[in-house]
Every structure is written in C-alpha cells, then in structure tokens.
Regions:
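Residue-level signal for inorganic ion chemistry
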Residues: 10, 29, 58, 92, ...
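Short glycine-rich anion-binding loops that position phosphate/pyrophosphate groups of nucleotides
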Residues: 30-33, 133
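Hydrophobic helical membrane-anchoring modules
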Residues: 134-162
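Conserved core of the sugar-phosphate nucleotidyltransferase
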Residues: 21, 34-128, 162
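Conserved strand-to-helix beginnings and helix N-cap segments that scaffold or border functional pockets
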Residues: 7-8, 37-40, 140
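Conserved small/polar residues in nucleotide/adenosyl-binding loops
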Residues: 1-2
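Short, well-ordered alpha-helices that flank and scaffold nucleotide-derived cofactor binding pockets
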Residues: 12, 16, 45, 120, ...
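Active-site nucleotide-sugar/metal-binding loop of Leloir-type enzymes
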Residues: 5-24
C-alpha cells in the first residue's frame, strides 16, 4: 500500500508540473538499477503508439498456479504465453492518475502494481521485452548477481568482448 501511495503522490506532483496534456510517465522501481536507455526508449514509443508499456521478461522456469490454501497445483501455464512483469511500467499520465483515483475511491487493495491496476480498470496493456539483467536488488544474492553483471559489462568495455 505504501508503494502505491508513493506512486500516487508522484503522479499528482507530475500532473502539477506537466506542460502537455499528453504527458507520459514511466513508473520504475528504485530496486532495479540496471535499466538501460533502450528500455526507456521502447517504453516511451509503446505509450505513444499503444497507450501503455509493461516491461517484461520471458519466463525461464516453469510457473505453477496453485490452489489457494493447499499444496496442490491448479494448472501449469505455457511458458510461451507467460511473462514476468518488471519495470518500468509506462502510461499516459492522465490514464494512470484516473486509475489510482478510482482505486482509492473504491478502497481497492489487491492491485500489486500499476499494470495490475490498469488491467483491473479495463485499460489495454502492451508488452515490451526487457533485458534479463533488469533484476530487483532485494537480497544479498541479488546484489552478487548485479555485481557479476556489472563486471561482465566492464570487461566488455575494457576488452571489447561481446
């Protein structure tokens, strides 16, 4: 809930300073520091063309949808039709602000991120493929993974490796 309130506060501030009626916002997690210029550009272009952009990554492992309250599997979705939602998640400012205001007025508490909220309120969501290294850094293991990614990129720059 705190994250959503923080996003909403940021959206209200963005609305106050927006100069265009059609302003684009990219909502990004501070715990994803490995974002790159291409992801940002792809998000902006997708919003211009389709009205939204949800950065995703292809699923590499089997996803299990379980029956709530039990240790049983309800179904196994195809990897071909499954993606992991990441950030940034990007929209027209007015659209995402309206969705937040509707969620607040309804007392909605189940939307875990911006794309979940936008889908709940009937907006079409368009996906862009993001890089695998756009990971969340929330555990020591994530930190070491990030460090390895940065070292690999540094070696590419120093030694011209691809």
């Amino acid at each position: 809930m705190y994250k959503r309130q923080s996003i909403y506060n940021g959206l209200k501030s963005a609305k106050q300073i927006a100069k265009d009626e059609k302003s684009i916002v990219l909502i990004h997690d501070g715990v994803r520091p490995l974002i790159n210029e291409k992801v940002i550009s792809d998000n902006i272009q997708s919003v211009i063309k389709y009205g939204s952009a949800i950065t995703t990554a292809k699923v590499k492992e089997t996803i299990l949808v379980v029956n709530e309250g039990t240790a049983t599997i309800d179904y196994v979705p195809s990897r071909n039709n499954s993606r992991v939602a990441k950030a940034p998640q990007s929209f027209w400012l007015d659209d995402i602000l309206k969705a937040h205001e509707k969620a607040l007025s309804e007392g909605e508490k189940n939307c875990i991120d911006s794309c979940t909220m936008m889908q709940r309120y009937g907006y079409d969501l368009y996906l862009i493929d993001g890089p695998g290294e756009n990971i969340k850094i929330t555990t020591p293991e994530d930190f070491y993974t990030m460090r390895a990614i940065l070292e690999a990129k540094e070696n590419e720059q120093i030694y011209g490796l691809e």
